[in-house]
């Protein structure tokens, strides 16, 4: 693993890059982009991060394709619409938005996972597919629903995901590597998430006698 740190002072942005290459045709990158000037407006910070990210794709990371992006916002309710408008225009991978303010007081940070020599596309069911050689990976992000409580929401989310996997000849037990759940007001809502998750897992042969995700 190789680690790099770059400062783009003209854009008030710092970038951390972790790269892995074992000499085969596919290299992997995790990059974190974060503003350094808290006094800039959210729009200015978003534009600066986008400009730096695009410059990386045409420079140091040329040939790499994004498979997953996660934005960390200080105020998702008021900032998400502008971000989604821009992200939809450049939609090239699974996208996740989380309200988790950067520690340095700025309003937005971005984590991106990229690979080289992959072909990616969005599937009709909403998953993103990345293919290299004989391998296929499926990514999803920003799934949510407005069911009455956290239990119902979790059950619907997982059942929808099970169906998405089935359409690709996959199962939750055999092919899902990792899930992320972001829960508002954990003290109140987490119990419902756990209840629904465990109940769905049983139907998918994910038990103490097999394995969990």
Write out the residue ranges for each language-model feature.
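Short, polar/acidic, helix-capping and beta-turn segments at strand->helix junctions
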Residues: 1-213
């Amino acid at each position: 693993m190789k680690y790099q740190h770059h400062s783009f002072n003209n854009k008030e942005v710092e970038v951390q890059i972790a790269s892995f290459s074992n000499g085969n045709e596919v290299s992997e990158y995790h990059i974190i982009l974060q503003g350094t000037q808290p006094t800039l407006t959210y729009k200015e910070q978003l534009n600066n991060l986008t400009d730096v990210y695009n410059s990386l794709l045409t420079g140091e990371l040329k040939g790499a394709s994004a498979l997953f992006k996660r934005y960390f916002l200080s105020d998702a309710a008021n900032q998400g619409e502008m971000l989604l408008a821009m992200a939809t225009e450049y939609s090239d991978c699974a996208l996740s938005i989380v309200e988790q303010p950067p520690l340095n007081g700025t309003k937005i940070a971005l984590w991106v996972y990229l690979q080289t020599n992959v072909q990616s596309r969005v599937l009709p069911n909403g998953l993103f597919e990345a293919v290299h050689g004989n391998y296929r990976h499926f990514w999803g992000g920003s799934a949510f629903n407005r069911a009455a409580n956290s239990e119902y929401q979790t059950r619907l989310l997982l059942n929808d995901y099970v169906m998405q996997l089935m359409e690709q000849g996959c199962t939750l037990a055999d092919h899902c590597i990792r899930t992320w759940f972001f829960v508002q007001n954990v003290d109140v809502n987490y119990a419902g998430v756990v209840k629904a998750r465990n109940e769905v897992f049983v139907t998918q042969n994910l038990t103490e006698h097999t394995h969990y995700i």
